[in-house]
């Protein structure tokens, strides 16, 4: 609501006289004001406590610059600004009109040529933004104002230059979840194609009155965004095809704004604006200059027309009352279905971290960065008595409080006017992985005689772990783009290997321990000389994140699986690609060599395990998993069995016959990691339920449950002697557990 000025509010900012409040946020205030000539303006002011922070001033200046670069034809034009003032402020033109969200929610969806005109106007706006070298990154219904002359795009608080490499922590994801692109949700590079994906989502909302990817949980929304597109019977065929094109998972396959404009201009003049059922709502917005009241109303809405859709206070008509089904070219008589308000339009700040599949959706995201925690997460497990208190690293946060905190976008909707402002603040520690001094044993300690697990901690998420063949070294991969190598006996960090430019997802030692392989979100596989702590080779060929790697038993080959849907074999001696293993239709999560080195197995989100001949690269067999996702894989030491993890179960296969042998049940969430003990008697599994479970393979029953991690477990590895087990978790720890074999 519009409120009177409060005691302590400034009477004037720059040359603008403030007349009322439009909204307050955690870091700023938005006022209604008048220019010296009496024109209505909206003034955004940063609170003094944040104005004293140089980082805030820089970010605010960037927002001003972004809005100015685009200009006023497609946006709320910046009239004036002073980012160096005390406090910093920006004045923008007042645009009479409701937000798209308000209009559709209160009056119903758009249809036919009205929808096409909206689409063309939005594409023009995005084209102008992209032509200035910017990406909006928060394109959604509440950031679109329906003015009398067409739609306007507002809020450049999260817009970012295409060539910008500063101002946001690497891997940070910004935006509103239900309108994000797949690359936004997992922290990938975001370009103009990301806005095009969001455009498709906005048009689907405008045509149906509901967010197409909305679901009951945040995890489900993520899964829907990266899954098959929903059906849209409400859209005419041409617009449905356009929206589906915008929703291509591969950003390179989405149409450009120029291509979209060319399609929308065919057989359409653009004269259908404003939509008839919205004309009174758009026309009712009175210019502020029309009143001299000290607290003028921005909008006066007349009673709804008798022929229009029902108002929200009226009962919704029963769909059964209509004899005819509503067509794609005429409005539905029902108002949009209500969406869960806490998920639909609440912007979030996402700190890039390894992603975990949601517990319930049919198609989880890869075990990758960018997982959003549920709105009501499980209570954190208490720290065991031997573990000292530690500061948790930043996680995905859904910021939905009325008083915004650092990183929240505040959108103020008052009588049809939407004014949005954004100020970001967050820091991510760059502290390297380090042994926890309170639990690390002395150099003389025997790691096999520990009563409690030893803990190596990090201020970033730990996502990969591997023992060297002799068991003296432990390697770990994390979100800091580094590989860390520790001495197992002392807990001292021996090496930090630098070279990857993104998350290190997987690590594996060669059979002789001389080399270490690593796979990363930078789409490369790298080989390292362990003794010299130097990079030996870089294998390039994948076009997306490398999710898993494995050394062949003789050390001559490295296998890799990627989000690009392929597995690849690399020749270690020559540094060349030996084979590209094609057949999966979705991400390849896991790869594993058979102990004799003749086969390599790959597991995919397509629900299959494929067995490949290493020498020829030909497919030998396909195992259809009972669950839809194969997230992790391992061969038994004798090669007779293959195990994979999926939803909340662990599945055991007979390799020779391809028959399923047993399903281990006990986990309550996705199983990201599996490993056999060196003697094959035990099977370890790590899960999003924050536990590691050991299973007796012969007895086909649970042996032990290891508890202590407070976040999902991404990787497990047995010590070569089988008496300890290492685990890596999103909680920032790598734990080395003693294993009782009796």
From Swiss-Prot:
The active site is at 138 (proton acceptor). Residues 266-394 are annotated as: Disordered. The keyword Transferase applies. It catalyses: L-seryl-[protein] + ATP = O-phospho-L-seryl-[protein] + ADP + H(+); L-threonyl-[protein] + ATP = O-phospho-L-threonyl-[protein] + ADP + H(+). It comes from the Bacteria. It is an enzyme of class 2 (transferase). The keyword Phosphoprotein does not apply. GO terms for molecular function: ATP binding; protein serine kinase activity; protein serine/threonine kinase activity. Residues 16-266 form the Protein kinase domain. Residues 343-356 have a biased composition (Basic and acidic residues). PANTHER family: WD REPEAT DOMAIN 5B, WD40 REPEAT PROTEIN. May play a regulatory role during the complex growth cycle and in secondary metabolite production. Belongs to the protein kinase superfamily. Ser/Thr protein kinase family. This is Probable serine/threonine-protein kinase PkwA. It comes from Thermomonospora curvata. The gene is pkwA.
């Amino acid at each position: 609501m519009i409120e009177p000025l409060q005691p302590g509010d400034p009477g004037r900012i720059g040359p603008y006289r403030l007349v009322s409040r439009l909204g307050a946020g955690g870091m700023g205030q938005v006022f209604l004001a008048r220019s010296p000539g009496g024109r209505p303006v909206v003034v955004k002011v940063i609170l003094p406590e944040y104005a004293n922070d140089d980082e805030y001033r820089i970010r605010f200046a960037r927002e001003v610059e972004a809005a100015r670069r685009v200009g006023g034809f497609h946006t709320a034009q910046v009239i004036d600004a002073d980012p160096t003032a005390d406090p910093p402020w920006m004045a923008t033109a007042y645009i009479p009109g409701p937000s798209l969200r308000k209009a559709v929610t209160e009056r119903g969806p758009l249809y036919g040529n009205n929808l096409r005109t909206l689409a063309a106007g939005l594409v023009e706006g995005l084209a102008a933004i992209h032509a200035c070298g910017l990406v909006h990154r928060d394109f959604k219904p509440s950031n679109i104002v329906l003015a009398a002359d067409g739609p306007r795009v507002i809020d450049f608080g999260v817009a970012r230059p295409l060539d910008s490499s500063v101002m946001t922590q690497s891997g940070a994801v910004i935006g509103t979840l239900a309108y994000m692109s797949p690359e936004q949700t997992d922290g990938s590079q975001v370009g103009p194609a990301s806005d095009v994906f969001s455009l498709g989502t906005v048009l689907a909302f405008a045509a149906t009155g509901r967010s197409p990817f909305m679901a009951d949980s945040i995890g489900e929304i993520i899964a829907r965004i990266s899954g098959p597109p929903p059906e849209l019977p409400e859209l005419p065929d041409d617009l449905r095809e356009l929206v589906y094109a915008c929703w291509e998972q591969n950003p390179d396959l989405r149409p450009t704004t120029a291509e979209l404009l060319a399609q929308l201009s065919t057989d359409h003049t653009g004269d259908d604006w404003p939509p008839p059922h919205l004309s009174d709502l758009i026309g009712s917005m009175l210019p502020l200059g029309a009143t001299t009241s000290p607290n003028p109303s921005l909008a006066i809405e007349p009673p709804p027309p008798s022929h229009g859709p029902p108002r929200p206070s009226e009962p919704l008509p029963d769909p059964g009352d209509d004899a005819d089904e509503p067509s794609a070219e005429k409005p539905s008589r029902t108002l949009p279905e209500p969406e869960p308000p806490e998920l639909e339009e609440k912007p979030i700040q996402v700190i890039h971290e390894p992603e975990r599949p949601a517990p319930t959706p049919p198609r989880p995201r890869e075990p990758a960065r960018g997982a959003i925690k549920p709105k009501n997460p499980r209570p954190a497990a208490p720290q065991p008595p031997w573990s000292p208190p530690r500061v948790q690293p930043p996680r995905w946060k859904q910021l939905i409080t009325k008083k915004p905190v650092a990183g929240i976008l505040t959108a103020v909707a008052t009588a049809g006017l939407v004014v949005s402002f954004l100020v970001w603040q967050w820091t991510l520690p760059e502290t390297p992985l380090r042994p926890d001094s309170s639990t690390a044993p002395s150099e003389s300690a025997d790691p096999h005689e520990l009563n409690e697990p030893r803990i190596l901690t990090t201020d970033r998420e730990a996502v990969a772990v591997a023992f060297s063949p002799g068991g003296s070294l432990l390697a770990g991969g994390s979100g800091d783009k580094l590989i860390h190598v520790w001495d197992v006996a002392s807990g001292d960090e021996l090496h930090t290997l630098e070279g990857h430019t993104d998350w290190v997802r997987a690590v594996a030692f060669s059979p002789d321990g001389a080399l270490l392989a690593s796979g990363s979100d930078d789409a490369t596989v790298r080989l390292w000389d362990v003794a010299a702590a130097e990079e030996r080779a870089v294998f390039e060929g994948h076009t997306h994140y490398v999710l898993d790697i494995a050394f062949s038993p003789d050390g001559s080959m490295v296998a890799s699986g990627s989000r690009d849907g392929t597995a690849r074999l690399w020749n270690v001696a020559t540094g060349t690609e030996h084979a590209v293993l094609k057949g999966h239709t979705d991400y390849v999560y896991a790869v594993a060599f058979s102990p004799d080195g003749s086969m390599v197995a790959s597991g995919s989100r397509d629900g299959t395990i494929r067995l490949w001949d290493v020498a020829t690269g030909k497919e030998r067999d396909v195992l259809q998993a009972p669950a839809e996702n194969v997230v992790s894989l391992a061969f038994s030491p004798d090669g007779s069995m293959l195990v994979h993890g999926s939803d909340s179960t662990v599945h055991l296969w007979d390799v020779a016959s391809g028959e399923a042998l047993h399903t281990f049940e006990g986990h309550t969430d996705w199983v990201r990691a599996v490993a056999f003990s060196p003697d094959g008697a035990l099977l370890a599994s790590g899960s999003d339920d924050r536990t590691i479970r050991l299973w007796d393979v012969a007895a086909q029953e649970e042996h032990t449950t290891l508890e202590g991690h407070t976040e999902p477990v991404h990787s497990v590895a047995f010590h070569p002697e089988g008496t300890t087990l290492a685990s890596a978790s999103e909680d920032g720890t790598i734990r080395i557990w003693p294993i009782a074999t009796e």
